[in-house]
């Protein structure tokens, strides 16, 4: 019986604590097969009773004072007890310094590989059991963007010696700061032009992201303008004294500013260049390249078009810079007259550039027009050289319309896209300006939207609406248009009213010449007050005497009868309408000025 009991208790010493493992090898591994039961009982009895000398325990007693582990815990191995040290000569790179694999993939033409590279960035290794705080720490460290490169914004007075600064007046310091701002702006412009060539044009040409013809169309002759601005910078540098001051700059500007006419071709091509660039951005390779450049420090968080538009924005700053220099120049200074001449020169240059750009923009949109019917073609459209206004409005049915107001005709279109080419489909018949009638509609006069449910709903009525139509209702055409807000409505009113004013003032009835103006006290004796008054009289008469006929009536079969009825109503309502307008004008009340 005793040998069987000893055999059953044989694996128990294995489950003892580590303190018990310090015994002899024989005690730790258990007795051998030839060990007798009496020897085992004696040894175990002495070990168990060594901690308690006041009694002699039996063979079934266990005083290890340790919890008993379950049988399934015997096979559990703790990683903390293993020696996992790396070799001392192994190179280990910290995880935070490992670059994303997607960033290491160079731009390729294969779309599948490119999508793979984009997908890698969204992977998350869930086997990492770090705490959320540590994970957030690593992610924030790896996603910190590279800081953008900033330019020095130091003023001229900050770089001046203290003793020199005390010897100059406040006005002279401000004059020198204005001159320094002009020279510093020229330096920044030169750097941006070189950067556009080096960081955008040349890499895209080398990587075949765009063809040479496309790049020439987008960038233009950007390189030819770098020597132009370097020449001005050199002249200002030669005129600068050792102490950093510039005595005279007027003669330099008078001789240099006319050379800015070289920008006429570049500015005229900007609209077409912007359209081509937007079209090429649909190419994933182009978009990926531009996005990489945008995230680089050299771009200063500016996209490619911002660099291409810098010359135009620089041109419009020259008058402001010259006026600032003139403002702080003493009247007895020889630069006064020269600066005034320079301001006139730059204004003339900008006027010529704007005229050329307007003609190019006008022709660009004319080429984008598509006609559904040959009757829509009008020779006044092809002969247009000036585009007065253009933009998006909504029709009465809620559809988006794009309106072009040329100097002689107004064209309503619908934007369409065919084969990735944007164009404008002419909608209805174009309206010549001399036949155009503009009507102001108050908020809520017309319900917008063509749905059946909207006709019976109590929804908010339309705002910022007006109506345009033919003066002769025989073409059976009228358009109720809605602007986005009051500001855009006012802009459209001013533009359309200025276009139709010469025709309305010439054809105004003689009996309406005595109609007083609503705000005569605001006009005074201004030279253009009479012309403006005549325009407002004609437009006011048109808004007062016209009867609002629903535009759907023009499309029905009885259009001629409706026109005759409207004419009869006009004859009966003309005199009362004029009388009411005259009474309100003479009352002197706080009445808002009518837009039309």
UniProtKB/Swiss-Prot annotation:
The lineage of its organism: Eukaryota, Metazoa, Chordata, Craniata, Vertebrata. One of its GO terms (molecular function) is guanyl-nucleotide exchange factor activity. A motif (Nuclear localization signal) lies at residues 12-19, 66-72. This is Neuroepithelial cell-transforming gene 1 protein. Residues 386-501 form the PH domain. GO terms for cellular component: cytosol; nucleus. PANTHER family: NEUROEPITHELIAL CELL-TRANSFORMING GENE 1 PROTEIN, RHO GUANINE NUCLEOTIDE EXCHANGE FACTOR AT 64C, ISOFORM A. Induction: By TGFB1. Up-regulated by DNA damaging agents like H(2)O(2) or ionizing radiation (IR). The gene is NET1. It comes from the Eukaryota. It is found in: Cytoplasm; Nucleus.
